[in-house]
Amino acid sequence: NSPNKYFYTQERTLTRKKAYFINGGAGRVVASIPAFEKLYETDKDFIIVCEGGMDFYKGHPVLHELAYDNWHKNLFKDYIKDRDCFSPEPYRVWEYYNQKCSLAQAFDIAINNEGLRDLTDPTIHMNKQEMVQGFKVIEEIKAMTKKDKVVVFQPFGRTAENMGDFVIDSTSRSFHLNDVIRICKDLRDDYAVVVMSEFPITIEETPTVPIAIPQISDVRVWSSIIQIADHFIGC
């Protein structure tokens, strides 16, 4: 009975549908998109459990309907229970930590196991309202700073923490606060600087060239702002 039970279990494992858990910040979520697009070419029955939020899968022609917020009603009972679960980790991919591939390619290797290959750029599908909101923000900042060129600066990663007057990132995925201030001061001579940060940053202001730190909670609007801006610096 034992061998039969083994082969039965193995067969069930090979035919079971899959659930992929994606965690972390916006960069990781966006970087996973090309890998899932590739997976969809051969498997249309997987789901994505969005531990880091599903904002960047919204509006995608194929991934939106496969993506579930981790608070989705009856997620475990209706969607996960009968699936095999995977948590792809691009930072653990050999090609990535040996600097032979991008984060998107590392996701592709972890998810599709097809080795290193060329991928399309990840695309965020935004609606007209989001694009208009981003355009308005950019125009307001240009008017405020009297600058024609706009640079968006995202200095802190998802793992950064605000500790009093300091912003600390134990994983070293963020700029040091002193460097953030220095970069902002250098950039504002030539650009309208927009800082994308949930943490307060004190930068010595000049009356003629202020630095914008808009408190916008919607990351999709931020995506629109970044797309319309002339340059983006991020970590």
What are these regions (language model features)?
Residues 1-235:
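Catalytic machinery of carbohydrate-active enzymes
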